[in-house]
C-alpha cells in the first residue's frame, strides 16, 4: 500500500490513473480520505475555471472564424485625479488557457501572477499612455481614445479586428464594443490586467517622487488621504488640472 506522501505525489501529476483514485477511495486511513477530497475539490475548481474561460472566450471564438488576429483593448485610470490613463491592446493565441478576468475582480497578487504569462504567451501586446497634460487638453474620453489608438499602433502584429470595452477606437479596423467587456472577453480581460499592472507600478514610482499623497495605495484616486495631501502640499506636475478637486485647489 502506498504511503500518504506517495499518494500526494501521484495526485499532483497532470493525469491521475483511475486505479489510484479507486485505491484511495477504498483506503480506510483518514489521511487518504482527506487527500481524495482535496483532489476532488481541485478538479471541480479547474472544471469551473475551464467553463468560465470558455464562456469569456465566446466572442473571440466567433471572430476567429473570420479573423486570425483579434486584439482586445481596455483602459485603466480614467477616474483618478493624478497620473495617466494607461491602455493595452492584447492579441491572444487561440489556445490561451490562463484564467484571466476583469482586473478589478482580481487581487494585486493574482494580477501580478497573470501579467508575465500574458506578456510571454500573447502574440502581441501594445501599450498606450495619455498623460495628465493630454487629459487636460483633450478631455478624459478623447484622451483615452487616443491612448487606445496608440496601443493598437504599438502592436508588433497588426490586428484584423478589435474587441473593446465599451469604447470606440479611432482606427480604421472592424471593432466590436462590449459592455463590461473585461468580464466577457479574455482578450479584453488580459488587456485590463496588463494596463492595471503597468499603471499601478507607475503610481508606486510617483509615490516616491511625490510623497505625501499616498499614491502607492490610492493610485491617484481621490481618497481622503490624497485630498489631504492635495490640501497640505498643493498640486504636483502629474495632477489633472481640469478635474474638480485639483482645479479647486489651484483656485484656493
From Swiss-Prot:
The UniProt record lists the RNase H type-2 domain at 68-252
Database matches in PROSITE patterns: RNASE_H_2
What is a single cellular component term in the Gene Ontology annotation? cytoplasm
Transmembrane stretches in the record are: none
A GO term for molecular function: manganese ion binding
Which SUPFAM superfamilies would you find in this protein's record? Ribonuclease H-like (SSF53098)
Name its co-factor(s): Mn(2+); Mg(2+)
| Annotated residues for binding of a divalent metal cation | 74-75, 165
The enzyme's E.C. designation:
3.1.26.4
User: Which PANTHER family does the UniProt entry name for this protein?
Assistant: RIBONUCLEASE H2 SUBUNIT A, RIBONUCLEASE HII
Function, as annotated, reads:
Endonuclease that specifically degrades the RNA of RNA-DNA hybrids.
**Family statement:** Belongs to the RNase HII family.
Report what the protein is called.
Ribonuclease HII
Recall the taxonomic lineage recorded for the source organism. Answer: Bacteria, Bacillati, Bacillota, Bacilli, Lactobacillales
Q: What gene name is listed for this protein?
A: rnhB
Amino acid at each position: 500500500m502506498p504511503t500518504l506522501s506517495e499518494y500526494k505525489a501521484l495526485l499532483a501529476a497532470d493525469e491521475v490513473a483511475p486505479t489510484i483514485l479507486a485505491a484511495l477511495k477504498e483506503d480506510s486511513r483518514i489521511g487518504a480520505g482527506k487527500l481524495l477530497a482535496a483532489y476532488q475539490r481541485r478538479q471541480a475548481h479547474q472544471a469551473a475555471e475551464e467553463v468560465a474561460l470558455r464562456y469569456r472566450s465566446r466572442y473571440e471564438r466567433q471572430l476567429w472564424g473570420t479573423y486570425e488576429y483579434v486584439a482586445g483593448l481596455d483602459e485603466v485610470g480614467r477616474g483618478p485625479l493624478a497620473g495617466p490613463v494607461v491602455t493595452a491592446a492584447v492579441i491572444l493565441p487561440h489556445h490561451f488557457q490562463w484564467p484571466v478576468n476583469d482586473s478589478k475582480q482580481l487581487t494585486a497578487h493574482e494580477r501580478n501572477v497573470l501579467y508575465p504569462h500574458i506578456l510571454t504567451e500573447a502574440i502581441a501586446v501594445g501599450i498606450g499612455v495619455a498623460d495628465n497634460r493630454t487629459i487636460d487638453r483633450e478631455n478624459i474620453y478623447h484622451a483615452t481614445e487616443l491612448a487606445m489608438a496608440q496601443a493598437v499602433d504599438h502592436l508588433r502584429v497588426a490586428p484584423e479586428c478589435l474587441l473593446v470595452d465599451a469604447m470606440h477606437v479611432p482606427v480604421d479596423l472592424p471593432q466590436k464594443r462590449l459592455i463590461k467587456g473585461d468580464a466577457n472577453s479574455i482578450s479584453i480581460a488580459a488587456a485590463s490586467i496588463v494596463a492595471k499592472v503597468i499603471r499601478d507600478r507607475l503610481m508606486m514610482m510617483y509615490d516616491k517622487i511625490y510623497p505625501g499623497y499616498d499614491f502607492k495605495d490610492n493610485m491617484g484616486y481621490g481618497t481622503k488621504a490624497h485630498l489631504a495631501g492635495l490640501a497640505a502640499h498643493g498640486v504636483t506636475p502629474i495632477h489633472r488640472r481640469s478635474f474638480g478637486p485639483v482645479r479647486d485647489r489651484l483656485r484656493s
